[in-house]
Amino acid sequence: MITYSHQNIDQSDIDALTKALKDEILTGGKKVDEFEEALCEYIGVKHACVLNSATSALHLAYTALGIKEKIVLTTPLTFAATANAALIAGAKVEFIDIKNDGNIDEKKLEARLVKNSTDIGAISVVDFGGNSVEMDEISNLAKKYNIPLIDDASHALGSEYKGKKVGSMADLSIFSFHPVKPITTFEGGAVVSNNKELISKIKLLRSHGIVKKRLWDSDMIELGYNYRLSDVACALGINQLKKLDHNLEKREEITSFYDKEFEKNHYFSTIKIKDYKKSSRHLYPILLFPEFYCQKEELFESLLHAGIGVQVHYKPTYEFSFYKKLLGEIRLQNADNFYKAELSIPCHQEMNLKDAKFVKDTLFSILEKVKKGYCG
């Protein structure tokens, strides 16, 4: 099975893990600081806090911003954690529709802010598939209305926007180190920022809100959590980060092949990355034309049967039964249509061009046999 994404674990990772496992300290040690420093250097920020998941990172980012009982404006086209973490932090969530590239529509965001901005606690955007949002426009809106901006860059480590690394431009930015993401620490995440005060608050909450006066004496000054990432996981993260740019080049080779082969086909469109952006290529989404919406499940199953691991990114968050109970029925046209159209096909550094050609040939072969049928 050629999976839609895949971790890259080689002997250097195994060696790094083995060495870390032999250390006296397995958690709360020097490797945590080293990983945070490496992330800061790579992304181009001053401060970082690594945690046990991106969900934890989101939760503490929202909490540090003090968004309780306020509204978080976010995208529905994301993993549920983007909104869930805001609710856990005591906020309300409101979804803004997307554009045809899967990213939040900055014009619709502006229209919502013009309507009323006094109750907004944060704007939380997602760089879908590794393709940066229009950060200039969104950042300007956040500054104009004096609203904190969170960039959920879980897909986008290594991505760039106008020459700057994604993760260096918002008040707080989030990264994920789940195995399908650009680098992995098994599970893990991080918050990065140039705001020392916010990161200090997040680091305090990461470990129970406890500060140590002396080795044997501590004080709990906040109600915190156990969201720590182990030294063993950080050792893997440090080594993974060293390989990231090389792995992104390999992903780009696969996507360049797809872009060329899929141009002007009769079945689907692809997402074009603008010249002033660089994507991590976490995902390679294809967007079926409307006449194939009804056949998407058939296509999905046929591809799996052929050994091609596909996935759908994402069911809009407001479509989950929990959110229907919470918010009622919501219809956002672009997000609805994107969900009907989207399939993520294999694209990762473990593939070669032979694999990509197999995916392309199989995809077209199956689509040729699928009957068109408009289904709304």
Swiss-Prot record:
Pfam name, any one: DegT_DnrJ_EryC1
Root EC class: transferase
Signal peptide: none
Species this protein is from: Campylobacter jejuni subsp. jejuni serotype O:23/36 (strain 81-176)
NCBIfam families named in the record: PseC
N6-(pyridoxal phosphate)lysine: residues carrying this PTM: 181
Functional description taken from the UniProt entry: Catalyzes the second step in the biosynthesis of pseudaminic acid, a sialic-acid-like sugar that is used to modify flagellin. Uses UDP-2-acetamido-2,6-dideoxy-beta-L-arabino-4-hexulose as substrate producing UDP-4-amino-4,6-dideoxy-beta-L-AltNAc.
Keyword Transferase: yes
Family: Belongs to the DegT/DnrJ/EryC1 family.
GO molecular function, one term: pyridoxal phosphate binding
Protein name: UDP-4-amino-4,6-dideoxy-N-acetyl-beta-L-altrosamine transaminase
Residues noted as binding substrate in the record, renumbered to the chain: 4, 24-27, 54, 176, 226, 311-314
E.C. no: 2.6.1.92
Gene Ontology terms describing biological process: polysaccharide biosynthetic process
Keywords, sorted A to Z: Aminotransferase, Pyridoxal phosphate, Transferase
Transmembrane segments: none
Catalytic activity entry: UDP-4-amino-4,6-dideoxy-N-acetyl-beta-L-altrosamine + 2-oxoglutarate = UDP-2-acetamido-2,6-dideoxy-beta-L-arabino-hex-4-ulose + L-glutamate
